[in-house]
């Protein structure tokens, strides 16, 4: 049907198309352009204005109280990145270190450890010995110690324990360095006649909070027991204890109580017993730039209490550049066989236990200037029973008597450390002590001046470590010939060390002590060892 309509339209329109082709061309005008023209008009300016606002609203003042809004946020979704991570460094729990020394020496260290989520245990042992008997008769000594230790975590509590044994063997070899002015003959002695040993067994346990608790209280309780004996029938056993309880206030201030004390029993030809206790409550106020801690130390003595002030003020004068600290404190300590033989092993071990009341006024400063990190300190110390050491009169084998005296000491210390080039750093320390002794002419065998300096280099890959250190000790007074004051020759010791790591497990070291060969004595007639090379290897596993 649609096709029929199209065909019919075609036939009807054809005659008109044919007739149009017969029209003359001059009869048709084609208009190509058409322009619209407006009548002349006059331009008028018009300024728009906003309509007048009709409203009865007046300005209002609102006071809104600040109120924190508790908003719970869902934990962020952590998605792993498609990046290759560097493998973490392997942690080794055990090591073995062995080395040889001259003259005729050996050193060995071993450590074995294991840890889990709620405990850690370990064992360590150390042995060192030197024998210069071929040069100086009986100049030889050795040291051996071993320790078992561990920590157990149970809830918010950490329990630490330690059990150890140590033995030190030495000889009173100073007889061969005596001079004729001592009116003592120089005699050869078999080793067993000048032999001394100190054997000690110790055990300790401590309890502390391993994490923050709801009461905002931190605490630590510690106790230690030891038994010490020597080769001359001296025996000592002691029990020490200490604790610290701190209550935090407003997250920054604190009230704390510290206590520490000990009880000792010494046996030789007679028994001696001595105990002491320090109890120190204090309050600490902390501000953004300063801290003040004030309290007092109560010391029971003869049925009464001695009271020492305890004050510490710390202030940041220049952020990181200068921090100063001033304070005063006092406490009681004890001089016993253990502390005396650790300081001077060449004493005559028939001693007197002695309490020592120590009072200290101090000022400190530390910080950094550019690359330099520094620290300075000055102390004015009074001690009621500072141990001094002089030779036993008329004893052919040199041993030292212990003398207690009231001594006032002014001690000045300055130290610093600074990198001078990449991987190269310089460090140093200077200490000066001036003694004012009540009943003696000098602080016998106490060091007056100490000087330390060091240069350390570490390679970029951390495999090479090289260092050189200088130690100097001087102004050590002694009683010459039993009648006059004199000073020991200065001790000057230069040491160098080189350590190289072949792999994460294996490294080696070489260390040379006393490169200058300075044998000057720390204790009268007990000349030190000369040049002491040490070569060794360390393996981690």
Residues covered by each model-derived region:
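Outer-membrane beta-barrel translocator/receptor signature
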Residues: 78, 87-134, 138-146
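Residues that define the transmembrane beta-barrel architecture of outer-membrane proteins
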Residues: 90-92, 104-106, 140-144, 195-201, ...
